[in-house]
């Protein structure tokens, strides 16, 4: 039987040495929301708790300023 190889999750922000996650960096924030607009949990992305809190805050600010949508386009 073949064993399933699970890739080790790592925090991208720790590896890059990011101090603060900026709400204006839409390209980065889009990687951490689903197609329906939900914030992806850290157990899936591998983000550390400190950066997950900053990420959630940045996404919520970007939504408030209409830089990111709250939900997907309902058609």
UniProtKB/Swiss-Prot annotation:
What Gene Ontology terms describe what this protein does at the molecular function level?
A: small ribosomal subunit rRNA binding; structural constituent of ribosome
Q: What processes does the entry annotate via GO biological process terms?
A: translation
The record's section on InterPro entries has: Ribosomal_bS18, Ribosomal_bS18_CS, Ribosomal_bS18_sf
User: What GO cellular component entries does it have?
Assistant: cytosolic small ribosomal subunit
Which superkingdom, per the lineage? Bacteria
Could you tell me the keywords of this UniProt record?
Ribonucleoprotein, Ribosomal protein, RNA-binding, rRNA-binding
Subunit composition and interactions: Part of the 30S ribosomal subunit. Forms a tight heterodimer with protein bS6.
Family that this chain belongs to? Belongs to the bacterial ribosomal protein bS18 family.
Family annotation (HAMAP family): Ribosomal_bS18
- Give the protein's function: Binds as a heterodimer with protein bS6 to the central domain of the 16S rRNA, where it helps stabilize the platform of the 30S subunit.
Protein's recorded name: Small ribosomal subunit protein bS18
Gene source species: Pectobacterium atrosepticum (strain SCRI 1043 / ATCC BAA-672) (Erwinia carotovora subsp. atroseptica)
